[in-house]
């Protein structure tokens, strides 16, 4: 069974996507065709979005599901004229919040993305630069400045998790790939041993890892299920030998991985 889901926003669409993905993941038997429509900031753009939604409804023979974070009341009114199930995320929560606080909201677009705090912006930019400079074991001399060092086999989610921790929480993150050569005697590389208290491991299901690696190098030893299984068994043995906390990321989104890493390591976020 297929249905179309739209994520509609006057900004980047990230909020609508995040909430929408969380909700739709509860309906595993339905295949959703997902469409993001960001920066809908005028009456004309809203009507164009409505036309696309109505077209999908006609083609699918079923109402699309629309997750909307439109703030402007006129745009929201136009949207509600389309043939779809509208989940108005601002409309659902803004009015009760106004009633409780006794204050009318500004209904201004992109308030959440304004750079209100120059210091927070600086922290975020510096954290992202650090994550990029210390990605994939390229440099290890600055590990003393890292808040956390993610380790794991190739293609296990280290880089995107590091970038998310930097962007969302302002943390200085590094990551280091463990290879077959590191598993001979289960010794940690010297660069990691010196910062063992900062290490956090990621692991993943062997079949899932094989599928991910096959997208890059199909048919190679690197992507074979046998190779992936061997690496992961040795990896988890290394984690256990050195008492390194780790997380199975197979069924988790990057957001979920990052939040759990933060909690399990007891790290304090620099950005609120």
Curated annotation (Swiss-Prot):
Keywords: Kinase, Nucleotide-binding, Serine/threonine-protein kinase, Transferase. It comes from the Bacteria. GO terms for molecular function: ADP binding; ATP binding; phosphotransferase activity, phosphate group as acceptor; protein serine/threonine kinase activity. NCBIfam families: PRK05339.1. Belongs to the pyruvate, phosphate/water dikinase regulatory protein family. PSRP subfamily. This is Putative phosphoenolpyruvate synthase regulatory protein. Its EC number is 2.7.11.33, 2.7.4.28. Bifunctional serine/threonine kinase and phosphorylase involved in the regulation of the phosphoenolpyruvate synthase (PEPS) by catalyzing its phosphorylation/dephosphorylation. It comes from Alcanivorax borkumensis (strain ATCC 700651 / DSM 11573 / NCIMB 13689 / SK2). ADP binds at residues 152-159. It is an enzyme of class 2 (transferase). It catalyses: [pyruvate, water dikinase] + ADP = [pyruvate, water dikinase]-phosphate + AMP + H(+); [pyruvate, water dikinase]-phosphate + phosphate + H(+) = [pyruvate, water dikinase] + diphosphate. Disulfide bonds: none annotated.
């Amino acid at each position: 069974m297929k249905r179309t889901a739209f994520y509609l926003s006057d900004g980047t669409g990230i909020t609508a996507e995040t909430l929408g993905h969380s909700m739709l993941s509860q309906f595993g038997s339905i295949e959703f065709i997902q469409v993001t429509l960001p920066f809908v900031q005028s009456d004309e753009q809203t009507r164009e979005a409505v036309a696309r939604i109505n077209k999908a409804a006609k083609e699918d023979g079923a109402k699309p599901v629309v997750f909307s974070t439109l703030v402007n009341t006129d745009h929201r009114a136009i949207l509600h004229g389309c043939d779809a199930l509208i989940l108005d995320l601002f409309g659902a929560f803004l009015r009760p919040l106004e009633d409780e606080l006794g204050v009318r909201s500004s209904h201004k677009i992109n308030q959440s993305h304004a750079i209100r705090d120059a210091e927070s912006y600086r922290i975020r930019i510096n954290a992202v630069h650090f994550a990029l400079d210390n990605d994939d074991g390229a440099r290890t001399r600055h590990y003393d400045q890292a808040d956390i060092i993610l380790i794991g086999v190739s293609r296990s989610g280290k880089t995107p998790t590091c970038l998310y921790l930097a962007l969302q929480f302002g943390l200085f993150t590094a990551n280091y790939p463990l290879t077959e050569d590191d598993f001979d005697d289960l010794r940690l590389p010297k660069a990691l041993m010196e910062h063992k208290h900062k290490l956090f491991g990621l692991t993943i299901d062997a079949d899932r890892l094989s599928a991910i690696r096959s997208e890059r190098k199909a048919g190679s030893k690197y992507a074979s299920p046998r190779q992936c299984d061997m690496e992961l068994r040795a990896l988890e043995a290394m984690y256990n030998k050195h008492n390194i906390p780790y997380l199975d990321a197979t069924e988790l989104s990057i957001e979920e991985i990052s939040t759990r890493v933060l909690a399990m390591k007891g790290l304090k976020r620099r950005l609120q």
